[in-house]
UniProtKB/Swiss-Prot annotation:
Classification via NCBIfam families: atpD (TIGR01039)
Keyword Lyase: no
Keywords: ATP synthesis, ATP-binding, CF(1), Chloroplast, Hydrogen ion transport, Ion transport, Membrane, Nucleotide-binding, Phosphoprotein, Plastid, Thylakoid, Translocase, Transport
GO cellular component, as recorded: chloroplast thylakoid membrane; mitochondrion; proton-transporting ATP synthase complex
Ion transport recorded as keyword: yes
Record's protein name: ATP synthase subunit beta, chloroplastic
Cellular localization per UniProt: Plastid, Chloroplast thylakoid membrane
Amino acid sequence: MRINPTTSDPQVSIREKKNLGRIAQIIGPVLDVAFPPGKMPNIYNALVVKGRDTLGQEINVTCEVQQLLGNNRVRAIAMSATEGLKRGMDVIDMGNPLSVPVGGATLGRIFNVLGEPVDNLGPVDTGTTSPIHKSAPAFIQLDTKLSIFETGIKVVDLLAPYRRGGKIGLFGGAGVGKTVLIMELINNIAKAHGGVSVFGGVGERTREGNDLYMEMKESKVINEENLAESKVALVYGQMNEPPGARMRVGLTALTMAEYFRDVNKQDVLLFIDNIFRFVQAGSEVSALLGRMPSAVGYQPTLSTEMGSLQERITSTKKGSITSIQAVYVPADDLTDPAPATTFAHLDATTVLSRGLAAKGIYPAVDPLDSTSTMLQPRIVGEEHYETAQQVKQTLQRYKELQDIIAILGLDELSEEDRLTVARARKIERFLSQPFFVAEVFTGSPGKYVGLAETIRGFKLILSGEFDSLPEQAFYLVGNIDEATAKATNLEMESKLKK
């Protein structure tokens, strides 16, 4: 991994004298820059425009070289607004791709695409930066062992387990608990795996980014008193920013995650919200550069751009990056090129259901719609696989019977079906779980449930061991022993009321 020492001002001034160009044309966020013969910058080099606008205010715009046009000209995309720029202004070739701060000092902080802190907490205290453009790890460096990434969340670990170093798609509308699930995963990876997380907000609403930051502070995922104890670094490139920034902010977040994996040898969780906006920004940039559009108006380089990001998210022999990517599906069309290209890279899908959220079952992960390539007997073992399949079959049968129950009532069902419904309702409630990050809202302590405990609990419910217990005993508990203890308490309470 190439790490650059932080550039100091004297070096910049030497570089300014060395390679200086001038703006020849500006069309929105696209700049054409002329350089002296033999001094052309490389593709992806950072260019910096410094000067003053007509009102005398300072301008500092960073761009990235995208095309070499010939006649000693390059075409670059601006990473911030180009207001105030004019033809003839000096442009400095930085000689390297964009580089961003990396390491422990980034935890608890919010950055923009350039790696500049935007949280008003002063400069970042780090002496190391790293370029955002890198090759994916060589095949010989990869860790090819298939291992499960335990999250401590029952429904995920049992029915749609995550792969260590894998990629997971998170599907869900507004208000079904996506943010809380993300924060719980960040909390659990820090506690159980000693890992850290990086959150990349790609082209989403500024308000949502702010809400996430405030909730993270409230739930102590970000520790305001001691930032070094925080568990996450945040990188935002929101909806109002130019397409260049939205296209590169995912790479900025990934670069920070790679440092934790390769240098600190940690397990890292990388969140990208939303991967569709990354594709959308690439499509805008492609159109601005004058490329011929491909299917449905997307960029012709869609698969290449997606692959160059996704192939860097992997497990190596040093550590792993497990990525959870929120996927927006335009017009609910799964055949749209953007989600279709994303699906090719995913190992698991976690689908959040509005129906479960309405019932108050959190996390509202749909046990029948969520899938994982890891749920195979040779990977997870026979016991885990059989238990998961039986749970799914029971829930599927309950789903099929719901219409009959709604019309005729439970009494019209056969004895066997009534037993299936009773167990399915217990399973449905046992798939809920109190979260650590929700303690401040619910008042009940969070629970981390190991995989072995999860399997044991569901096996006991399926075997009929707890057919006599009330279903509310299984709601919002950790392992199965807590459910039996809760049942005893409920029984004592009902006796006292009598």
